[in-house]
Design a protein with these regions (language model features):
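Phosphate/dinucleotide-binding and metal-coordinating scaffold of catalytic cores
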Residues: 1-180
Length: 180
């Protein structure tokens, strides 16, 4: 993003809607007296009470109720570094929490099943037992508004995060990567 404003404004909009978004700071970089330019530094997405507030799932959390969270999962294009946890159509999903190397088969099966349930109920007319029982609707509305208003070319198949706390619903976000 040559303007250096897309990430900053998208994250600001998300925070104004009441959601976590990475903190961003502009900084001018000078190395040994040589000006390198203006850059945007931003927080990495991770789990803690001031960022994505979900419990950190442990390797021993393989049965109900503990297996229900917390997860941070992203739809992303992989470059060979991150192992794909599961696929939905042409979209690859990668674990962010638990870390890919720490995710158990049971945890991967659980979170994949949650995404499949969401997809299965996406067009249900049943408002009581349909998609509203699976997803946090306001988080999806906010997520879609920010991404659409900012014309995020990556959204839905790449750089798209979701999270789920223990016992909670699947939430969209945090928003990420508006530099295209």
């Amino acid at each position: 993003d040559p303007s250096l404003v897309r990430d900053y404004l998208a994250y600001y909009m998300s925070r104004e809607l009441g959601n976590y978004a990475s903190k961003t700071e502009y900084c001018e970089v000078v190395i040994n007296g040589d000006y390198k330019g203006l850059y945007v530094f931003q927080e990495k997405i991770k789990s803690n009470e001031n960022r994505v507030n979900v419990l950190k799932i442990e390797a021993t959390d393989n049965a109900l109720p503990n297996i229900t969270g917390g997860y941070i999962t992203k739809a992303d294009k992989t470059t060979g570094g991150d192992p794909v946890a599961f696929w939905m159509d042409e979209t690859k999903f990668v674990h962010d929490l638990p870390k890919p190397e720490n995710a158990t088969p049971e945890q991967t099966q659980y979170i994949e099943a949650e995404f499949n349930r969401m997809e299965d109920h996406a067009y249900d007319d049943d408002l009581e037992d349909g998609y509203r029982t699976i997803i946090d609707v306001p988080s999806f509305v906010d997520f879609m508004l920010v991404n659409e208003l900012c014309s995020n070319a990556d959204v839905y198949q790449s750089s798209t995060f979701f999270h789920k706390d223990r016992g909670g619903k699947l939430r969209a976000g945090p928003v990420w990567d508006f530099n295209q």
